[in-house]
Amino acid sequence: MRVNIVCSKWGTRYGPHFVNRLKNMARRNCNDRHDFHFYCYTDDADGLDPDIKVIPFPDIPDIHPKYWFGTDNFKYGMARCWDRPKTMVFNTHNFADDKPTGRFVFFDLDVIIQNDIEPLLTYNMERPTKLRSWWQDPRPMKTRKFKLAHGAYTNGSCQVWSDDQAECIWHDVLENQEKIWFTYTDGTDNYHSWRWGDWGKKLWDHFPADYAYSYNRGRSWDDDDLETEIYRETPILCVFNIDLLPEQMLKGRGSVKQNELVDPELLKHWQ
């Protein structure tokens, strides 16, 4: 099976070593029987390893970072739907020069791959599948405030699909981007949760709670496994979501960024 790992990098928050280490982790944890390829969408390819297939961000108004990154179109200091360039990855089978087919796995740069990714590749071959924030308290999700704010219950740190299964997302963005940026202001996780999730077109399936954990949130609310800033050996992925705004920061949540990590067990993987 052809396996296409995809990521995206823009601006200066993440250096090239984040991309290179992600590639190394993905390759180490992908079975040798697969045909492995690694792609990176970026506005600056300096420092990337030579075996990474670079895709310059297509020059599409209001989606390419140059049209909004650092402009005045911000909310609380962040661009409306600040990670919008990540929507391009769902059209990688057309944007990449080699027109890849097979399984596509998108990873955020602030992910650590701890174990074999085979379960991610084979969990559901019939539907696109992504992480869900199982560590999140489900009670606020039932409130009117959560629905009016289009709150997010999915986590885009890992998203998997086959061939053109997710191309419909890219077409939706092209056709409705102004509405999307101003409706789902806090990011693409909000967009996916409502437009394509349980309250939308039900495109996405979700990986089980034991596939990933958040270093700053825990693993599962239902399993009462919410201790933060600890290494969990068995999950496939560790993600590093943090609160971006002071009013979001809640007691009991960690705030460790990946480049501040000192945990020796996790650092063994992140290289």
Residue spans for each PLM region:
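N-terminal anchoring/stem segment of glycosyltransferases
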Residues: 1-70, 97-100, 163, 241-246, ...
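Residues that flank catalytic or metal-binding motifs in active/ligand-binding sites
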Residues: 34, 50, 86, 107, ...
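Short, hydrophobic beta-strand segments that form beta-sheet elements in well-ordered domains
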Residues: 35-43, 103-107, 111, 128-132, ...
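GT-A fold catalytic core of metal-dependent nucleotide-sugar glycosyltransferases
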Residues: 54, 84-138
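A short, glycine-/small-residue-rich helix N-cap motif at loop->alpha-helix starts
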Residues: 61-65, 78-85
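Short, P/G- and charge-enriched loop/turn segments at secondary-structure junctions
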Residues: 73-78, 142-149, 223-226
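Conserved catalytic core of nucleotide-sugar-dependent glycosyltransferases
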Residues: 117-189
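Catalytic core and acceptor-binding pocket of nucleotide-sugar-dependent glycosyltransferases
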Residues: 156-271
